[in-house]
Curated annotation (Swiss-Prot):
EC number: 3.2.2.27
Gene Ontology biological process terms in this record: DNA repair
Entry function: Plays an essential role in viral replication as a component of the DNA polymerase processivity factor. Excises uracil residues from the DNA which can arise as a result of misincorporation of dUMP residues by DNA polymerase or due to deamination of cytosine.
Class of the enzyme per the UniProt entry, highest EC level: hydrolase
UniProt record similarity statement: Belongs to the uracil-DNA glycosylase (UDG) superfamily. UNG family.
SUBUNIT field: Homodimer. Interacts with protein OPG148. Component of the Uracil-DNA glycosylase(UDG)-OPG148-polymerase complex; OPG148 and UDG form a heterodimeric processivity factor that associates with OPG71 to form the processive polymerase holoenzyme.
Protein name per its UniProtKB record: Uracil-DNA glycosylase
Transmembrane regions listed in the UniProt entry: none
Top-level lineage group: Viruses
Catalytic activity: Hydrolyzes single-stranded DNA or mismatched double-stranded DNA and polynucleotides, releasing free uracil
Length: 218
């Protein structure tokens, strides 16, 4: 692991070698906006903004991307809910349960699945207010997601409205699926077959499928 310093909390960002090419720009962009976004109480706390940068990218095939952290109790790991109370991860687990037949589980975490990096486009929000920090993170968000897409085969974005123009923001030729948000009304996410489709797309790209059942916690 490597680390760099920034002028505001969290003061130090620890990161895996695979993120090295973007770190100078990240530091520059963060120092520009940190004083603005740190005026608010944030979810997650600043020490957890950059936790996912500890993840390697060279072994990832799929990025599962949400728009921003839970407005309360964000852990820095996208979709993670240690007490398994958040609707989004419960809906994701339910979808994977239908796909895999696994039923006796106590939780689900995308971050423990081989080949998958869960990501949030914006890395924080004001406590209780989703998408409230979008304007501050915008440059950093594009920089980091663009870097991720150089490594993965499939980018799966959750939220048809939030990600309607995501392809225009990407410079890498990555296969992109824009699906329903897990909390979408009329149970639209339930009918979404994206987790299956991802494995078909990986196969077409001569990559190993994702074992989605690995994410279950018992």
């Amino acid at each position: 692991m490597n680390s760099v310093t920034v002028s505001h909390a969290p003061y130090t960002i620890t990161y895996h070698d695979d993120w090295e090419p973007v770190m100078n720009q990240l530091v520059e962009f963060y120092n520009e906006v940190a004083s603005w976004l740190l005026r608010d109480e944030t979810s997650p706390i600043p020490d957890k903004f950059f936790i996912q940068l500890k993840q390697p990218l060279r072994n990832k095939r799929v990025c599962v991307c949400g728009i921003d952290p839970y407005p309360k109790d964000g852990t820095g790991v996208p979709f993670e809910s240690p007490n398994f109370t958040k609707k989004s991860i419960k809906e994701i687990a339910s979808s994977i349960s239908r796909l895999t037949g696994v039923i006796d589980y106590k939780g689900y975490n995308l971050n423990i699945i081989d080949g998958v990096i869960p990501w949030n486009y914006y890395l924080s929000c004001k406590l209780g207010e989703t998408k409230s920090h979008a304007i501050y993170w915008d440059k950093i968000s594009k920089l980091l997601l663009h870097h991720i897409t150089k490594h993965v085969s499939v980018l799966y974005c959750l939220g048809k409205t939030d990600f309607s123009n995501i392809r225009a923001k990407l410079e890498s030729p990555v296969t992109t699926i824009v699906g329903y948000h897990p909390a979408a009304r009329d149970r639209q996410f339930e009918k979404d077959r994206s987790f299956e489709i991802i494995n078909v797309l990986l196969e077409l790209d001569n990559k190993a499928p994702i074992n989605w059942a690995q994410g279950f916690i018992y």
